[in-house]
């Protein structure tokens, strides 16, 4: 797994992840800036078979990466309307889940957008499994909790039904680590239990079921 970023930061400063496998590489949440240095670096790491993103806020540069490597662009059917820049060839659309490469599966969770997704990497965390979550599941600074965001700029939460849908979508998968959309923080261990526990805590706050002085 390789991280790819831009300095100084572009847009909201997200960090891309390159998942490398014996049958090709997946670029997840591509950064909003692409130049020859980045192309050479990714080519040296094996190039790209496919490009995708956790949600439409990170769709902007997918077409550029696709054209640079003649790679597939993968887009949830629910969010296809947000893909406004034409990729090298018609995008591959999917719903529910999509096995992209051996051990790498895209999982539609909903929440932030209808097609918001995570990538499950079975070989991550030393074989214990990892999620690449963008902000579908948002790792908090203490690296011991996660949260869920409806609109980050407007500071709006997700409703209970959406939180439960996100957790239910990832529940069948084995994972011990979560890489969010930025260099830090990373939820390094016990991630599945943390997601379940954090979701219940989040829902308690939505319902007002917290102490007067929490």
Functional labels for PLM-detected ranges:
Residues 13-15, 22, 88, 103, ...:
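A structure-centric signal for secondary-structure junctions around beta-strands
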Residues 3, 53, 75, 92-94, ...:
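Structural signal for conserved beta-strand scaffold positions within catalytic alpha/beta enzyme cores
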Residues 1-7, 99-106:
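Short Pro/Gly-enriched beta-strand edge/turn motifs at strand-loop
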Residues 32-102, 197:
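Active-site HxH/HxHxD metal-binding segment of metal-dependent hydrolases
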Residues 1-22, 193, 211-214:
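Zn-dependent metallo-beta-lactamase
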Residues 15-17, 96, 117:
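Residue-level detector of beta-strand structural context in well-folded domains
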Residues 24-36, 49, 71, 81, ...:
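Metallo-beta-lactamase
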């Amino acid at each position: 797994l390789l991280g790819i970023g831009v300095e100084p930061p572009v847009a909201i400063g997200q960090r891309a992840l390159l998942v490398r496998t014996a049958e090709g590489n997946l670029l997840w949440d591509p950064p909003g800036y692409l130049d020859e240095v980045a192309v050479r670096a990714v080519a040296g790491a094996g190039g790209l078979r496919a490009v995708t993103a956790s949600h439409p806020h990170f769709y902007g540069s997918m077409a550029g990466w696709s054209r640079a490597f003649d790679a597939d662009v993968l887009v949830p059917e629910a969010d296809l309307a947000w893909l406004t820049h034409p990729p090298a060839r018609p995008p591959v659309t999917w719903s529910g889940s999509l096995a992209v490469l051996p051990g790498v599966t895209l999982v539609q969770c909903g929440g932030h957008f209808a097609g918001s997704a995570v990538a499950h990497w079975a070989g991550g965390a030393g074989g214990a499994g990892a999620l690449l979550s963008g902000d579908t599941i948002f790792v908090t600074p203490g690296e011991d909790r996660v949260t869920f965001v409806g609109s980050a700029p407007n500071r709006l939460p997700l409703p209970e039904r959406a939180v439960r849908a996100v957790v239910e979508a990832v529940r069948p998968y084995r994972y011990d680590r979560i890489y969010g959309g930025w260099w830090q923080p990373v939820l390094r261990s016990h991630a599945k239990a943390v997601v379940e526990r954090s979701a219940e805590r989040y829902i308690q706050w939505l319902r007002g079921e917290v102490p007067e002085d929490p």
